[in-house]
Amino acid sequence: MPILHPDTIHLGLDVHKDSISAGILNPGQETPDVEKIFHDEESVRRLIGRFPDPRLVRACYEAGPTGYDLARLLVSMGCAVR
């Protein structure tokens, strides 16, 4: 397992047809912030755009028909996806 950068942002995504619930654990936090966004490309880009460097984002998502396109989008933006 690779050693994580101290500024790594952990992002957990619960994907639904019309929405995504995002759990965001920023460096130094013990409890993630949770928010709900629309399940569209613009909303995902806006979410990832809030972070200083998408390469520091480590995302996990719910695999399935609603998650695969999301995973491809996140990878194209530079995020690590599991």
Where are these regions (language model features)?
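Phosphate- and other anionic-substrate recognition elements at nucleic-acid/protein interfaces
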Residues: 1-82
